[in-house]
Amino acid sequence: MNDNAKVFSLIEMREMMIDTSDYQMMEEVGEFTGTLEMKAQGHKKSIRIFLTLDDGRKIITPIFWWQTYLGFYYMPIGTKLRLFYSESSLNIIYLEKVEVIGQEQ
């Protein structure tokens, strides 16, 4: 795997003292554009993706194995994305679809 596509383990994040406190869960449905900043292991075969939206918000989103990780597992950091968030029948906001629109220079 390309180092630019690395998925950090929880131990690596702790050892490197990576602070993710600025990131919040997405709270609205809609289409957004942003940049992939980092990826980390989650729980129960998931990964967490860290995004900066074009409006400046910092978002954390869990992606699950049954979503085939939406292509994020091997996606390079810095990838510009169009993100489509939806609401489940349980009123949970989730990332339904993603489109690559470019690579940050």
Kindly label every feature range from the protein language model.
Residues K39-G42, L53, S86-S88:
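Acidic surface patches and DE-rich sequence motifs
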Residues M1-N2:
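N-terminal intrinsically disordered, low-complexity, charge/repeat-rich segments that act as generic
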Residues A5-K45:
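Structural detector for short beta-strands of small beta-barrel domains
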Residues R48-D55:
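Short, acidic/hydrophobic/Gly-rich beta-strand patch recurrent on exposed beta strands
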Residues R57-M75:
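Beta-strand/loop nucleic-acid-binding surfaces
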